[in-house]
Amino acid sequence: MKQLLNTLFVTSEDIYLSLDGENVVASREQQAAARYPLHTLSGIISFAYPGASPALMGACAQRGVSLAFCTPRGRFLARVCGESNGNVLLRRTQYRTADDPAQSCRMARSMIFGKLYNARWSVERTRRDHGLRIDGARLEQASARIKALLPLVAEETSLDALRGLEGTGATAYFSVLDEMILGEKPVFSFPGRSRRPPLDPVNAMLSFSYSLLAHDCAAALESVGLDAYVGFLHRDRPGRSSLALDLMEELRPCMADRFVLTLINNRIVKRADFTYRENGAVLLSASARRSVLKHWQERKRESLTHPYLGEQLSWGMVPYIQALLLARTLREDLDAYPPFLWK
């Protein structure tokens, strides 16, 4: 099984990355600030503008270390990829499946089922654990609305209709997300989803966490030989990792959303951790990004029992396991893709 190595996050905006022997060197004003052995890293995510040296990019490509560049706000810019893993037959099958609406719908159906299942379970978990602190009736209604969609998703044969069901479920889920935030109101109130730019602290953290999850999903797909840019639910768009977005759908509620709720409800983040721009945008401060990244890595090391495999593994391995199951489904080793159903 793949070993879960470390991910290096570069959050200082003036850091330049280079290669010295077998080490990644982080430099500020041409002075080495830190060194990291390359063999201990599975990925590097830079939120800095200076960039990285061609030598480091080449070494990462050769060794399968994912190197991604994001803006300081967390918006994905680019990723350095080396030679594709796996054989060409798997990718040919992926492309044929993506070009076939019926087969695409079969794959997307499982992913959306997983997303709505996990969204409902997240709501139910809040009802169970914090019944005296929430509006239980509202959460029960939202849970029932999402539950009613699951059999419809399981039988749907149209991609457009499937997207409509997903949207209906997302509306029900986000309508009660504010109830799942247990403290620090009104700073951490959730009026609804906003992006590009996020307009409140909760949306700022959601967008940042989704960027991290998308990177992990893209790296996982590439590691098993799939093309992260050709999806089944999300269609082709230049520069968009469509299959990574597909894969992360089922993981959003349990990996990203619950992570954000934990940060808020455990008072790990505060109002002072955000900057408020004149255009209404709300962004995580540099120190807050470092704190969020630290807790993200800690969360990925926590263990769980995989619902399909029945094996103990870390949360950080979940995208890799799901990517592997997706590849096995495309090879017809499995009859259908088994989504991650959080329990």
Q: Each predicted region: which residue ranges?
A:
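Terminal-proximal segments
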Residues: 1-72, 82
